[in-house]
Amino acid sequence: MKDIELGASVSFGCYFWRVLDIQSNLALIITEDIIEERPYHDAYKDITWVDCELRKYLNSEFYDSFNIADKRRIIPVINKNLDNQWYSSKGGVDTRDSIFLLSIEEACRYFGDSRSKLQNPGKNQKYWFERKDENNSKRIARPQGKEWASWWWLRSPGRVNVKAAYIHGDGNIGIQGNNILKGNIGDGKCIGGVRPALWLKIEE
């Protein structure tokens, strides 16, 4: 991984990852595929990233799936969790994360800046169905082993705090959000795609 480059696909742990950013000897990487499907939270209540079950899972059980050598290369960072700029729902406090989801702002930074096209004033503001842009294809992801695309979570809030933002199956940014818990946990309808991201120390 010495010759790591922006946009490259790299193997780390049990997954292939896309390199989104390089800063000094660190690389921001995100899984190429949707590696699993989970709810954002385990209860239908107002929540932000700091307290959601998906964050706890990524920084405990998922983090612990890496071996000791790999864990040493995963560098914790302080993440800014901004309010939803279209609906003013709260993003919550900054968090220290080893593993995390991208925010709306990071999705725009690394997969093409679509913020100007998200401006669709109106009661329903259904950008992802009404407006398409050239960056959609960059954000499309598929579950591992599947041929079709599916939607995946962002950590940012949706229009209210019982919803979290997401990337639609066609690559559009869902600024209104999906319910953090879609149905009951037992019925299998509460899940969304998970593409973990992390800052990785580049081997010398």
Labelled PLM ranges:
Residues 1-204:
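Collagenous Gly-X-Y triple-helix signature in extracellular proteins
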